[in-house]
Design a protein with these regions (language model features):
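Cleavable N-terminal export/targeting peptides
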Residues: 1-22
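Outer-membrane beta-barrel "beta-signal"
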Residues: 22, 253-265
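Transmembrane beta-barrel strands of outer-membrane/channel proteins
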Residues: 25-31, 81-87, 136-142, 188, ...
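Residues on the lipid-exposed face of transmembrane beta-strands in outer-membrane beta-barrel proteins
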Residues: 27, 67-73, 121-125, 138-140, ...
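Extracellular/periplasm-exposed beta-strand and loop segments of Gram-negative cell-envelope proteins
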Residues: 33-64, 85-117, 144-179, 206-208, ...
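Transmembrane beta-barrel architecture of outer membranes
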Residues: 179-185, 211-219, 229, 252-258
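Transmembrane beta-strand segments that form the barrel wall of outer-membrane beta-barrel proteins
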Residues: 196-211
Length: 265
């Protein structure tokens, strides 16, 4: 009898342990349309003109990838973990007048490029877990990339050509972005009763001194068998900051639809 009770206890604890282990992995593609302004002023100077991302830089709709992985840990008081990666790429051409960006100053044609990667590590707690699910926590986001401006043939420089700091036609001039940003994290999901459909809002946000940064995803999901599902929704990113790089000021938005393949295990 004792052996049977012990075996039953082990099996019960094993089921309980297995029940508490879970997670989710998703891979998606999101479409983003830019809007807003940016400027880059060399340190200790007053130069630097504000440019419009669409009209001056020629940025338009583009597509990029996004990855997310959630791990629900079975340890008491230990937070769950979410890892995420997304990239944000834009490129375009524009014709500018009285343009000033770092050491580039003048009028004419330019090529521009944004290459930005975001890496998230999120620790969160599950506050509700039934028809309504609610998570809250803290995200540490690492931004790495650059904004590059290249003056092309025909650009009329107003800075003296030939000086040590003078720009050159056809040479790209990147402005590097490299920083960590702490953000508050939250997720709310409504599981429609008796259906394999759920509605979800997930967001990160922070506002301090010269920076306001937030992103959110509003989505609907249909789950098939074995935890596999499809998710579609709307993703928006807003960044208003003077802290990305010394002299770089941005007030930009990227938003558009996205779709993901999801595995809930």
């Amino acid at each position: 009898m004792i052996k049977k009770l012990t075996l039953a206890s082990i099996m019960a604890s094993g089921v309980l342990y297995a029940d508490t282990i879970g997670g989710e992995i998703s891979f998606g593609i999101y479409s983003h349309t830019p809007s807003g302004t940016a400027s880059y002023t060399l340190p200790h100077t007053t130069l630097g003109s504000e440019v419009d991302l669409e009209n001056d830089f020629g940025w338009s709709n583009d597509q990029d990838i996004m990855l997310k992985a959630y791990f629900e840990l079975p340890l008491p008081f230990m937070p769950n973990v979410k890892l995420a990666y997304s990239n944000l790429n834009q490129d375009g051409t524009g014709n500018v007048t009285d343009f000033s960006w770092g050491i580039i100053s003048g009028s004419g044609d330019i090529e521009t490029d944004l290459a930005l990667q975001a890496y998230d590590v999120t620790a969160y707690y599950e506050l509700l877990d039934n028809v309504v699910e609610l998570d809250a926590g803290l995200t540490m986001r690492y931004l790495n990339g650059d904004i590059t401006v290249t003056p092309t043939v025909g650009f009329d420089f107003t800075t003296p050509i030939g000086s040590i700091s003078s720009p050159t036609i056809g040479v790209p001039y990147p402005t590097d972005i490299d920083m960590w940003i702490p953000m508050l994290y939250g997720k709310a999901r409504f599981n429609v009763p008796n259906m394999d459909i759920s509605l979800q809002l997930e967001a990160n946000a922070i506002s301090y001194e010269d920076t306001t940064f937030y992103d959110y995803e509003l989505s609907a999901r249909y789950t098939f068998s074995m935890g596999l599902g499809l998710e579609a929704g709307y993703k928006s990113i807003h960044l208003d900051s003077e802290d990305l790089a010394d002299g770089l000021v941005v007030d930009i938005d990227f938003s558009g639809p996205y779709a993901s393949i999801v595995w809930d295990f």
